[in-house]
């Protein structure tokens, strides 16, 4: 009888040990599944971008692929339009719709100044990948440009703006001419504002 009790106790201890050591792995797996379920896949982003830029827009897939390689899957996107101009000091104004992976939408506006060697004017469609936005209210702040992050392919441009751990990757396709080097930021607001600062 004592041999049977020892054997049963060993089986129970082994089972308990297996459950305790497997629990962190199960938790990590569910966290990963939850995280990937809260983000847009590459193909979902391409479908959303094509709805703004048009199907088969040359260069669009390349700039989106670059953002995916550098930052992974976004958990929100902004589809909109913007216009701006500069003679040394520039301004940019935009309006769009924030779309979260859960399907919630919200109108947003952005504006921002720039200072530098910059001249010209332009209007653009703007598709922004948003990373690490856990609360949509956190979008409404200033996002400085990330130095050295400008990338061009086939008329499309990509750059990054970042505050804390939230990163924005605006993809633009526009008309007009604006040339130069500048520094600035984008300020997102829940309603239209005329002052770009």
Which residue stretches match the model-derived regions?
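N-terminal secretory signal peptides that target proteins for export/translocation
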Residues: 1-6
């Amino acid at each position: 009888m004592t041999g049977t009790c020892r054997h049963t106790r060993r089986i129970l201890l082994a089972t308990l040990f297996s459950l305790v050591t497997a629990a962190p792995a199960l938790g990590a797996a569910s966290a990963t599944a939850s995280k990937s379920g809260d983000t847009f896949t590459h193909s979902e982003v391409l479908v959303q971008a094509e709805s703004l830029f048009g199907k088969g827009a040359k260069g669009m897939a390349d700039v989106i692929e670059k953002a995916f390689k550098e930052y992974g899957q976004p958990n929100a996107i902004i589809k909109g339009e913007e216009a701006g101009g500069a003679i040394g000091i520039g301004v940019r104004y935009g309006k769009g719709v924030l779309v979260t992976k859960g399907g919630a939408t919200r109108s947003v506006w952005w504006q921002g100044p720039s200072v530098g060697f910059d001249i010209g004017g332009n209007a653009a469609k703007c598709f922004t990948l948003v990373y690490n936005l856990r609360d949509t209210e956190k979008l409404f702040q200033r996002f400085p440009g990330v130095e050295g992050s400008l990338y061009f392919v086939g008329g499309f441009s990509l750059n990054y703006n970042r505050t804390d751990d939230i990163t924005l990757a605006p993809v633009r396709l526009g008309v007009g001419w604006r040339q130069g080097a500048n520094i600035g930021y984008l300020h997102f607001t829940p309603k239209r504002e005329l002052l770009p600062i």
